[in-house]
Amino acid sequence: MTAAAASNWGLITNIVNSIVGVSVLTMPFCFKQCGIVLGALLLVFCSWMTHQSCMFLVKSASLSKRRTYAGLAFHAYGKAGKMLVETSMIGLMLGTCIAFYVVIGDLGSNFFARLFGFQVGGTFRMFLLFAVSLCIVLPLSLQRNMMASIQSFSAMALLFYTVFMFVIVLSSLKHGLFSGQWLRRVSYVRWEGVFRCIPIFGMSFACQSQVLPTYDSLDEPSVKTMSSIFASSLNVVTTFYVMVGFFGYVSFTEATAGNVLMHFPSNLVTEMLRVGFMMSVAVGFPMMILPCRQALSTLLCEQQQKDGTFAAGGYMPPLRFKALTLSVVFGTMVGGILIPNVETILGLTGATMGSLICFICPALIYKKIHKNALSSQVVLWVGLGVLVVSTVTTLSVSEEVPEDLAEEAPGGRLGEAEGLMKVEAARLSAQDPVVAVAEDGREKPKLPKEREELEQAQIKGPVDVPGREDGKEAPEEAQLDRPGQGIAVPVGEAHRHEPPVPHDKVVVDEGQDREVPEENKPPSRHAGGKAPGVQGQMAPPLPDSEREKQEPEQGEVGKRPGQAQALEEAGDLPEDPQKVPEADGQPAVQPAKEDLGPGDRGLHPRPQAVLSEQQNGLAVGGGEKAKGGPPPGNAAGDTGQPAEDSDHGGKPPLPAEKPAPGPGLPPEPREQRDVERAGGNQAASQLEEAGRAEMLDHAVLLQVIKEQQVQQKRLLDQQEKLLAVIEEQHKEIHQQRQEDEEDKPRQVEVHQEPGAAVPRGQEAPEGKARETVENLPPLPLDPVLRAPGGRPAPSQDLNQRSLEHSEGPVGRDPAGPPDGGPDTEPRAAQAKLRDGQKDAAPRAAGTVKELPKGPEQVPVPDPAREAGGPEERLAEEFPGQSQDVTGGSQDRKKPGKEVAATGTSILKEANWLVAGPGAETGDPRMKPKQVSRDLGLAADLPGGAEGAAAQPQAVLRQPELRVISDGEQGGQQGHRLDHGGHLEMRKARGGDHVPVSHEQPRGGEDAAVQEPRQRPEPELGLKRAVPGGQRPDNAKPNRDLKLQAGSDLRRRRRDLGPHAEGQLAPRDGVIIGLNPLPDVQVNDLRGALDAQLRQAAGGALQVVHSRQLRQAPGPPEES
């Protein structure tokens, strides 16, 4: 008996292997459909029915002496029964083989495609199935003694099934089997799934085709032995199925799909499991082909099977044997290629052929031969019920089965996964809005809308809380947007709110607010939650060519420009918070986006997109704000947007309309912005958006702006905190990007200044700006300067470039990026600068107070007079400076670094004093404008723009910087306090003004270069100054000098005293603080500065003065 039992284990193994197949993959799904309890009971019931049906066949065979299924059917029901059994057997075997191929294609295609580097697809799947059929299935199927050859493979296949079961168990443990969470998520009884699962369960136990061959292969055939063999086999299979179904269902609960293997993540274990399962299925093919081929042979050649006594392994002519084998193997392969769903083929086959072969036919045969068999009645009726009900159910579900399995299981999984991802994303956005912003900026110009909305909500939440103050800040922010158009006019009121809060201050522009009614003023995005500094960064106008290039990035770029239109069009308002953190931690946030592009690409595309939108909207909406708006229009014209920008610049009402949705308005403005966003990418669409904005109630917009301004103040503090977190998070990213950008910009600088390395963000822009300048035909700057009312308006290209360059450093932590240092250094420098600037702010205030005292400072010199007078005076007072500006720019680089640091701080103070808080809020734009002006002045005063090659020039700059930069610093310091990025921007400005920080000098120099080129003589000086003035070293000096800025500012303030009284310190291209100041003193200061600069630079300063005039128009209007 022991030997017999041992020999029986080989048969048991074969039977188990023939039973276990692709159906095991559907067990968890069936448990989900029926519930754990009902599913287990159905499995046990189907196992019992299968055992009974097998015993029916064994007993019938022992009584009738027939050894084939078809022979028993012929013996019981004649030819009809034989035909029914043969066709059912053929259909069952073919369906099973098709299911095998489908599983092989599903499990093998992914693995082998990745293994060999192919793309998973229908072609590769077809190739895989063909290879498996030709190399594995066919050789095994062509063997005549299949039982002996397959046993070894059966044992190997069972090993994979065992491993599969343990993997399922471990998966359930991993998914919290003992935590008990699944108890609430699983179902225990679902009667509606019974008729969907019984066919699959019946198919999963289908082994009737192996009963008689196994019985015939026994040395001593007996019913008892067969009963024990099949009982053992079915018990093993039932246990296996219950374990797989239970643990698989617990692991994936309602997300369970038909093929549970597809749930597992891709790793070595699961991949080996899939391959092993695929191989076991391939090896199991011969077990299915054997009865199928025999049934086909008896069906086609029944004359040889007349008596039905031939055993299943009976002799078959070689030709027929091979033909039938090939037809079955490749026929089922075609079916496997055409039918991609395992559940569909198993359900249909099990409900029809499976029920006939497994239950109905054995019960009918046994009932015919054994007259009294109650069990046969039960099995028969169950089989008939399965045949009828389950077939109808399966057919009705057949179309849905793939969808249900895919949707309910994979879809459920995907839905849950997506839900979890959304929840996590929401958490991340709430916890780390900056991180979300960085991701948004990178991933999408399109997605920014949703992300912006999320972050806007975060920022707007506080913005909405202060509804009163936001009204002021929002219009001011809109004004900042206008400077961003290309007008370098600093926003005075942007700083007035709270210098430490860069966003609010940047947003606020009293001068622009005064110029344009708050209603007309585009509600600043800063009020909407954007950092004013970010707006300034976004504001820098770019040439049309650059804008077009960057328009695809406008989704991201438009966000930063801080234009209501850009935000509306791009739906970027939600990004305002992101931008706010960028302003505070601009190097972190913007570098992520900017770093996307080479150097300033990110910046340029955004400023350009913003410029196109902002110049259209700001020129349209900011025409009043910077009645230098027409000059920006002209500048825009230079950039390629002259018509729209200039036209809009002349239209003050439009800005009010467009900006209205921009100032971080409630969701309604956002919707309007979204509407405008559709056409916002184009100037015409922007105009339409402006019209839409007009439709918004100005009262509502003003109220919202006020609220947003108040909220922005609060948000500024919050944003600074967020910026710190964001900066930390993005330090590495920004550092890497900054390094890349530095490398690229440095290359640009190498072209620009062979001896000076230019900041990353500015290097590329300067190269572009210079190219644009070179390409641009020389244009008389005087008319342009006086375009906005007799005052010279800097060309937008210059402003844009200066803004871009300044924006690049701002986004990149201007001081830090040139060195490629991590943002943390710029941030630390910014913090230091902020502290220094805080000290310098009062100093700047004092200097500003002193400045108005000067007769020249108080009166605002006429554009023409200033154009000639300051330059002439500068030339007279510093006859060598104009030359030094051109020739001594490189010399200035050395002191310029120090001067850049000190000048930056001084300029920032001067800007603060001159521009007031608006300078800070408008710093990004103001800075670019000032930088462009200063750079233009520096270009005009070739030595002054780049750096104090000659210290007297530096001194000249320093007094002016002290006056202007003191005013700017007053605002800038507050703004720096508010925005580290803005501080750096102003630092860059200071660098541009004094040493012309290589970042700023580049942008300013590009602008200056363009203007000088337009001006025959100044161009040379500017070009000289530009190549010589640019130095990456300024970045570190700026950072280091930030500490020195206080002392330098003090010293320069002393120097400024005489300059302010007598002559404004000649602007060696350093004057950055010519921001439109709400105070008359600022205008006087600007006039005096312009006069001095013009005196020093002579004709060259006229171009710069035009820039100054553009910036200045705001203050005169304010005055």
Swiss-Prot record:
Name of the featured protein: Solute carrier family 38 member 10
Organism: Homo sapiens
Location(s) in or outside the cell: Membrane
Single GO term (MF): L-amino acid transmembrane transporter activity
Compositionally biased residues, Polar residues: 880-889
Keyword NAD part of the UniProt annotation: no
Location (main, coarse): membrane
GO terms for cellular component: Golgi apparatus; membrane
Record field: compositional bias (Pro residues): 652-667
Keyword Transmembrane appears in the UniProt entry: yes
